[in-house]
Swiss-Prot record:
GO terms for molecular function: GTP binding; ribosome binding. GO terms for biological process: ribosome biogenesis. This is GTPase Der. GTP 2 binds at residues 183-190, 230-234, 295-298. The gene is der. It comes from the Bacteria. PANTHER family: GTPASE DER. Residues 4-168, 177-352 form the EngA-type G domain.
Length: 440
């Protein structure tokens, strides 16, 4: 199930980033250190009362150039409208209600999404003298917090999770393959979608998604049911030059959250860009199936080695998604377009595949015989047995004697052996290490 998205919105200097960091806690550093993922602290994974959600810091989207504050706020509010399931509207409890706050509230009201008015910088147990001013906004009871001191955060998060509605982010049946078309602007995502939804497809209906210009389009291909989650509408916003890249990434986050399989579209004339790495990294982190689609292949001058050289470049630049199949296509000419849905279906099946425990342990045992487990100071790693815990992504529990003895390189070796024997093309694999003694 996709995680709900919570956006932190507010005019500059009301403490959005402080609140973001307080809610996200140490998770930010974990996200930052993973390969291919943005270091701009635009998003973080958070959890409260067993609810997992994605936190978006719209403060990180603000352009650096000197612009009129209401214009900046309009962009923030638009971003919240398009991506969030719940909006935290941060205001300054010391300063009171301002005209900019009123303008932002008016924009947020139009979203018809849950908005929680949050008075920050209330650093004492005494109520802000401006508390009742915020009832003028007509957005329910304000919540007082101090992000810097951590006061009231629990009450705020209680209110946030109360507003989660599973129907908002889990619209489709389990047998529908949800496909997100992701990638930086101007790589041909819209053209690819038009090709996929050609006359030979049966378009069921158009359902407005959680993003305003992204349309979720269900369709069938034979007996298979799909829904395409389109983020191509980001190109229409290209006038926001200062923040276009960050904006694109946030839009991709919303699409990835809803998807089973991501199509990472790369422009053949540009190769792999930094933004491609960031978007691919987010999909990988979230355990989504992945197909790399190299578009505009028709305009590339080729010889017998061109495709192999391009594959090598992609593998070198996107090492952490080496499992993803690569398809070279042209939306303009229709070249190899039939391969896309073939790979999507295959990857979706691989992402949901279960391996019998007996077969899994046989492969693990043979792998250990071929390449002895590491040791340290006379103590050798022992893998007692393995079992598959879940799918989407495939997740395996390894019961071992000592976690400290499991080197990253050896875990990668075991992963490669599992892939060699069972496949899992196009999907990340997760491992959970659990210690037990031989007597357990």
């Amino acid at each position: 199930m996709a995680r709900p998205i919570v956006a932190v919105v507010g005019r500059p200097n009301v403490g959005k980033s402080t609140l973001f960091n307080k809610i996200a806690g140490e998770r930010i550093s974990i996200v930052e250190n993973k390969p291919g993922v943005t270091r701009d602290r635009i998003y973080a994974e958070a959890e409260w009362l067993n609810y997992q959600f994605t936190l978006i810091d719209t403060g990180g989207i603000e352009p650096e150039s000197e612009e009129i504050i209401p214009a900046q706020m309009r962009r923030q509010a638009e971003l919240a409208m398009e991506t969030a399931n719940v909006i935290i509207f941060v205001v300054d409890g010391r300063e009171g209600l301002t005209s900019v706050d009123r303008d932002v509230a008016e924009l947020l009201r139009k979203t018809k999404k849950p908005v929680i008015v949050t008075l920050n910088k209330v650093d004492t147990r005494h109520q802000s003298e401006h508390f009742y001013e915020f009832y003028e906004l007509g957005m329910g009871d304000p919540i007082e917090i101090s992000a810097s001191l951590g006061l009231g955060i629990g009450d705020l998060l209680d209110e946030v999770v109360k507003n989660f509605n599973p129907e908002d982010y889990n619209q489709y049946d389990d047998d529908v393959i949800k496909v997100a078309m992701i990638g930086k602007p101007n790589v041909g995502k819209s053209s690819l979608i038009n090709r996929i939804l050609g006359e030979e497809r049966v378009i069921v209906s158009d359902i407005a998604g959680t993003t305003r210009d992204a349309i979720d389009t269900p369709f069938t291909d034979g007996d298979d049911r799909y829904v395409l989650i389109d983020t191509a509408g980001i190109r229409r916003k290209s006038r926001i030059t200062e923040s276009i890249e960050k904006y694109s990434i946030v839009r991709a986050i919303a699409a990835v959250e809803k998807s089973d399989v991501c199509l990472l579209v790369i422009d053949a004339s540009e190769g792999v860009t930094e933004q491609d790495k960031k978007i691919a990294g987010y999909s990988h982190e979230n355990g989504k199936g992945m197909v790399i689609v190299v578009n505009k292949w028709d305009i590339i001058e080729k010889d017998n080695h061109t495709m192999n050289e391009f594959i090598k470049e992609i593998r070198n630049e996107l090492t952490y998604i080496s499992y993803a199949p690569i398809v070279f296509v042209s939306a303009l000419t229709g070249q190899r377009m039939n391969k896309i849905l073939e790979e999507v279906k295959h990857v979706s099946n691989q992402n949901a595949m279960r391996i019998p425990t007996g077969a899994l342990n046989e492969v693990i045992g043979e792998a250990i015989l071929l390449n002895q487990a590491p040791s340290d100071k006379g103590k050798r790693l022992k893998v007692f047995y393995a079992t598959q815990a879940s799918v989407k992504p495939p997740t395996f529990i390894l019961f071992i004697n000592d976690k400290e003895l499991m080197h990253f390189s050896y875990l990668r070796y075991l992963e490669n052996k599992i892939r060699e024997n069972f496949g899992f093309e196009g999907t990340p694999i997760r491992f959970i290490l659990r210690e037990k003694t031989g007597r357990d």
